[in-house]
Every structure is written in C-alpha cells, then in structure tokens.
C-alpha cells in the first residue's frame, strides 16, 4: 500500500472511532487506543481541562506491557510550550530540560515525546500527546503533523458531543418545566375536585360511578352500608353522602367500632347516667344523641360483639334506646351509615353476626373500588398528597414523570392510605426537589407492601377461590393454618387477589356465572359462594 493511501486509511480509522455513537468518555478512549496502534505508542493520552459548565476530559492508552498513561502527569513546562506553539517534539526526554524532574522514576530508556494542541470551543485548551521509543529513522515532523490532524478531529468531536449534550440538557429542563406546569394545573384541578367531592380525589370511571351512586343515596334517609378494602376511603364517602343530603347542616358523627366489650360500646353509643357504673361521675351523652338530626357513621361494624348486636338492631328498627343506668327511653332521628371491610356473609354463616342485623344494614350497599381498579387516579392522588406535604412542611417537591409511572404500576393492597404513606415517607427522605423512581422504598426492598405481595405469589404460586364451608380450605392448607384476615396480613393480600381473579373471570364471561365457573374450573355454586363472600353484587355491576 502506498504511504499516502496508508495515511488515508489511518485517518479513516480514527474518524470512525470518534464518530461512534457512544458516551464521550468511551469514544475518546477508543480514539486514543486506535491512535496508539497507528503511531506505535508506548503510552499516550488526551487532556482537556475543565471550563465553565464543562467537566475535565481525560483519555489514556491501555497497552499491555507498557507503562500506564493514566498514572502519568505531563510536566507543566511541556504543557505550556504546547499551548504556546501548538505542537511539541522532544526526540529524547532524557536530554530535555522540560522533563528533567521526571527522569529518575520513569526508567523506560530513550524516549521521544510528541504533542499537539487541541482546540475546543474556539480556544486552545487541551493537548493530545504520546511517547514512543527513540528511533534514528523516525520522521518526527511527519508524525507531529499527523498528530495535529488527529487533535483537530478530536476537538471537533468534543465540540459536537458538548453541543448535543447542552441541547439535551436544555430540552430536559424545558420538558421538566412543562411537566411542572402540568403538575401545577393538575394539582389545581385536583383541589377543585377535592372541594367538589368532599376530599375524594380521582376521575376514573370506577371512582366516579361510586361517587355518583353516593350522591343519589344522599337524597334519601335510607341506611347505607359502605363496603370495601381497608384504605378505600369509606369515611370520605360517608361525609360525601352527609354533605349532599338534607342533613348537611346537622352533625356528622363518626365512631369506630373496635372489639370493645358490650358495656363499653353501649356507653359510647347510648351514653350513661351519673353513677351508672364505677367512674361514671357525670351524665354523658352518647354518639346517637350527639348525631340527632344528622348522620352517624359506624365504622368496622363487623367487629361488634354478638351480645350488643341485638341492642343495635332495636335502635335501627325503632330509633329509641336508654342510656346505661337510665330508665327513660330516648328517641332520635339519625341517618345511619355503616362501613366494613369484613366478610359479613361469612360472619353470618359462622354465627358471628346476626342474620337479621345483616339484612337490616345491607339493604343499600355501596362497594368502593380498590385503588388498583381506579385507572389513572394514582398520579392525581400522589400529586395531591405531595402538595399537602409541601404546604405542611414549607417544601417545594415535585414528581419526575418516571416516579408517577412507577407508582402507577404498584398494587397498593392498603389502597389510598398506603399510597399516602408511601408519598409522605418518600417526601420526608427526599434529597432533592425532584422525586424520581429510585427514591421509593420498594427500589431498595424496604417496602413491606411489595414484599407482602411477592410473598403471596411466591408461597402459593396461584390463588384459588374459596369453596363453601366443609370443602377443601383455601390453598389446600389446614383450616387452622389459614392466617387471620387482618389489615396488612398476608391473608388480606390473598383475599384481594382472589377477588380480582373472580371479577376478571366474570368480566371475561360477560358476567355469566356458569361461564365464569368453567373458566375458574369451579362449580357455579362455588362461584356464587365466592361472590357473596367477597361482596360482589352482580346485579349492581
């Protein structure tokens, strides 16, 4: 090959290395190593000092058996001369004043040093250099000329990369500003929806159907039973019903019915007279009296003891009661709303809940959708919770689009309450104003909910619909090994998956129970039982 053709091929090789679609650091390292093969370098490198808005750039050869260029520092005197003259040729560094302070530790024999300045952004700010063994027939002038051409190509490549990088940063900043603007508009809309629907945020079909139904229910005084998983917003819906009813200016009283004794529940709900029991030093008005003319929400109604259920049934039917320790019958006008996440049908079958009370309170049920069925609501809720956090703590945090995408893919078995906790925890620990997907606890395996769902899938492989009492228990486990269905337990997560699978099969079958039974490989009777157990009202759906 002619010498001119050989040089053309070499220039093509280094141009190809510089134009490769890789990161700048990788591109320049490949360029320097390609150059080292052409120029028979012992070692060489490229150095571009840091400038305003740009970081320092270095690249070094990786020749096996040769001294490392990455650990070598070119003398300042040599650098200054390159910057002044644009090039430098030192046939033997051992005899050069420029390198006198570095000869002792180098110990690599007679060595030539050749360098050329690199112009970046119309300023000479860096250099391309290499060393090679001193040879009598070496044409230094030709090599430094070739090195200057290579340095010119490298400078252009660096300028191109920096220009693209600056444009990408500008574009990303503009995109972020636009996203922040959309977030602000969304938060404003969310606040308007919040005011309109009394704290209920969202616009999914499932949620809006429940909201519209609740507003229709508000027009009458009928007893309402709110059903849904924990954290689905039963109290918010109770307030919505109250605020859209004719009782909106009257009291709204809420009472959580935990596993209290009959006497304590009776005292809390009906009140007591002075001296009715030890510690009753004064007359006390109960929740029913406090709610007279308004609305009373009794949450966790499935937890009240059987002995108290008969007394509650009397109040529901007749609207009258006596205070504990009293003889006077009191009558009240109260709109009753009950709420539960418990399987009341199973409780009735097990004798834990009175059948007559069940029919009395379940006449007008409203099933609240879990968060995983509310398509598109998670970003709206997350932004609203973050806005509330910002207002409470004087912060100015916002979500990156990737963060909202990540949240939208989460199951959240604890529903809205769990989502709010997730947002608050992440915001509290946020190290910058922009929350990204990597900031969430589940990314470091610190999310209990994530581990809970993984555990359910890994432990059981698949979930079957519960069969009626007396048949094989859920998942084939002994009846006494089935975990308690308490909020946050694996039993709850299992229950949620069962319900999802049941509804999916029914949707696929067009809500035909016989077809759904074939899909699930169950009998129609088992599917009917599962519908009752999970509170799925086929007629409503």
Swiss-Prot record:
Report whether GTP-binding shows up as a keyword of the record: no
Known DNA-binding region:
513-532
Q: Which residues bind a divalent metal cation?
A: 442, 447
Q: Where is the GAF domain?
A: 23-158
Q: Which domain of life is it from?
A: Bacteria
TM region positions: none
Domain Sigma-54 factor interaction, first and last residues per copy = 200-428
Q: Which GO terms describe its biological process?
A: nitrogen fixation; phosphorelay signal transduction system
Region C-terminal DNA-binding domain, annotated ranges: 499-541
Which residue ranges does the record annotate as region Disordered? 170-191
Which InterPro entries does the record cross-reference, listed alphabetically? AAA+_ATPase, GAF, GAF-like_dom_sf, HTH_Fis, Nif-specific_regulatory_prot, P-loop_NTPase, Sigma_54_int, Sigma_54_int_dom_ATP-bd_1
Subunit and partners: Interacts with sigma-54.
Q: Which PANTHER family match?
A: PTS-DEPENDENT DIHYDROXYACETONE KINASE OPERON REGULATORY PROTEIN-RELATED, TRANSCRIPTIONAL REGULATORY PROTEIN
Q: What is this protein called?
A: Nif-specific regulatory protein
Instruction: Name the source organism.
Output: Rhizobium meliloti (strain 1021)
The record lists the lineage as:
Bacteria, Pseudomonadati, Pseudomonadota, Alphaproteobacteria, Hyphomicrobiales
Its encoding gene is what?
Answer: nifA
